[in-house]
């Protein structure tokens, strides 16, 4: 079933005007839907699309929790024919491609390519790498973390490295480039699809993990919880996050050669020094950069998100 509806989406500096098209849906009104929402990007000057996933039973209730997902460097694209690459990893892969019942509205935008199209992992990708949707849903997944993962002891002995290779904006040509557009997407999705503005969570992997820290620091009052995966923050991010008491669950891979573990500690130590009451840090010591596969496969991150709400 496919249909098109016009959503008046006008949002400040982002200058967004959008429509939404059902990409795919089952005939049952209780079935999940995947929609493409069009907007005019102020940053690129072109029309682009982003995905909005609506969970099973969406039409029967309101005040759904909302999740903004920021992908990694390898899923960049033109926001049109290349948008499907954002289905490759993360919560949208789990909810849509794996046909998994995740009770969130999921917003999944695509970062523009800018001049990073020559990266080997981008040049090597093909449409064949885009996963198809499973005909039948998967069984509930297990938790991936056990025990209390809140910071319980000083981390100064964890080999912190205060000489970070990146400034507060994170990696070059990252998600900060479309900051206003991302916030506009959240606001419009909440207004148009029965989202709960007090339960908007943020997560991302690699480049998206860096983007999570940036958005959390600059829009701490927007989110109920944030989970950056294999992306570290800058110590300058700590003060606004701590002031807002924004819950964080940070994930790293102990064998990650791309985003070294030692770079996570400066911001975590700063948050601890500021007395932030809700910081979790999980290091999957046996995993490398693809730590996000285990994290997003598990149930515990989603269960934690569902417990969070802004006052």
Predicted regions and their residues:
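A domain-start/cap signature at the N-terminus of enzymes
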Residues: 14, 19-66, 74, 104, ...
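C-terminal catalytic histidine-bearing segment of alpha/beta-hydrolase fold enzymes
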Residues: 251, 257-311
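Primarily recognizes the serine-hydrolase "nucleophile elbow" in alpha/beta-hydrolase
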Residues: 198-240
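The conserved beta1-alpha1 loop
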Residues: 70-71, 252
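Catalytic His-Asp charge-relay segment
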Residues: 245-252
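Conserved acidic catalytic loop of the alpha/beta-hydrolase fold
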Residues: 181-197
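N-terminal secretory signal peptides and thylakoid transit peptides that target proteins
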Residues: 1-13
């Amino acid at each position: 079933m496919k249909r098109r509806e016009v959503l008046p989406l006008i949002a400040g500096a982002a200058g967004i005007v959008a429509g939404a098209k059902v990409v795919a849906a089952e005939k049952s009104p209780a079935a999940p839907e995947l929609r493409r929402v069009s907007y005019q990007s102020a940053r690129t000057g072109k029309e682009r699309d982003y995905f909005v996933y609506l969970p099973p039973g969406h039409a029967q209730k309101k005040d759904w929790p909302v999740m903004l997902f920021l992908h990694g460097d390898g899923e960049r694209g033109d926001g049109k024919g290349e948008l499907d690459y954002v289905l490759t990893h993360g919560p949208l892969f789990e909810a849509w491609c794996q046909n998994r019942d995740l009770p969130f509205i999921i917003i999944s935008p695509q970062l523009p390519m800018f001049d990073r199209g020559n990266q080997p992992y981008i040049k090597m990708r093909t449409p064949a790498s885009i996963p198809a949707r499973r005909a039948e849903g998967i069984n509930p997944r297990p938790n991936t973390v056990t025990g209390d993962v809140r910071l319980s002891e000083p981390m100064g002995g964890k080999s912190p490295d205060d000489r970070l290779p990146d400034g507060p904006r994170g990696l070059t040509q990252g998600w900060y480039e479309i900051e206003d557009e991302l916030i506009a997407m959240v606001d419009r999705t909440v207004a148009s699809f029965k989202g709960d503005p007090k339960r908007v969570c943020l997560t991302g992997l690699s480049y998206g993990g860096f983007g999570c820290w940036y958005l959390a620091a600059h829009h701490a009052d927007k989110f109920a919880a944030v989970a950056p995966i294999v992306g570290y923050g800058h110590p300058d991010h700590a003060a606004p996050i701590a002031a807002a008491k924004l819950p964080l669950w940070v994930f790293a891979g102990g064998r990650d050669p791309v985003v070294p573990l030692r770079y996570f500690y400066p911001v975590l130590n700063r948050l601890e020094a500021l007395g932030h009451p809700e910081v979790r840090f999980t290091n999957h010591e046996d995993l490398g950069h693809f730590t996000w596969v285990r994290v997003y496969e598990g149930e515990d991150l989603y269960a934690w998100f569902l417990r969070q709400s802004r006052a």
